[in-house]
Amino acid sequence: MKDKRLILGVTGIRSDYDLMSSVYRAIDDHQDLEIQLVATGAHLSDSYGFTVDEIRSDGYVVADEVESLLNGDLAPTRVKGLAIQLQGIVQTVARLSPDILLVLGDREESITTALVGSYMNIPIAHVGGGDRAVGNVDDQVRHAVTKLAHIHFATNRESAERILRLGEQSFRVFDVGNPGLDRLLQTPPMDADELSSRLGFTIKDGEPLIMLIQHVIS
């Protein structure tokens, strides 16, 4: 009998790792749980900073590195990468036999991990189900992961209600908030001078500032 439950998280890029960092830390600090991570996708690319090194520097065990990025901008390239990733995650999960698989949102590693867990009868915990991103494939992937998952950690009440409307049992759905806010709350605010230095142009206290963020269509 294992002393601790093994939670295997799968992360594919710095952005999802940052969002989940407080969750990983809480698991790591729990006396009855063990966290290991699979690094895949952009984490293993020099073009994106080879951020698997950041995961290790944070003190986490990287259970495996699953290469999945292929050069090319066409849709078939992304699907081929997904297929490669699926094979790699199968091998890792078969070797480790984790108690729970942990995924975030709507990316390739979310759907591949959820498929592996479903076919191998391993519970899947999904963070960020029920959210909406109209106009791209993310919505379909996220809802598909929801239907494959067993435990749902929604980031807001509306998303939790959407998960319930998809037919999930209420005792499996938890409205826990967005874990990405934990990192923001722990980050000291910058004054105008420091922000100006970071951005490379002058910002003055009290003057209006507009920030525009564009989410690419995937």
Can you annotate each of these PLM segments?
Residues D16-L19, S45-S47:
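Short N-terminal binding/cap micro-motifs at the start of the first secondary-structure element
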Residues L37-A39, V66-N71, I124-G129, G177, ...:
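Short beta-strands and strand-loop turn motifs
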Residues E34-R78:
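Conserved nucleotide-sugar phosphate-binding/catalytic loop shared by glycosyltransferases and other
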Residues T11, H43-D46, A149-S218:
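A nucleotide-sugar donor-handling region in carbohydrate enzymes
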Residues L6, V10-T11, D18-D28, S68-S170:
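Active-site and donor-binding regions of nucleotide-sugar-utilizing enzymes
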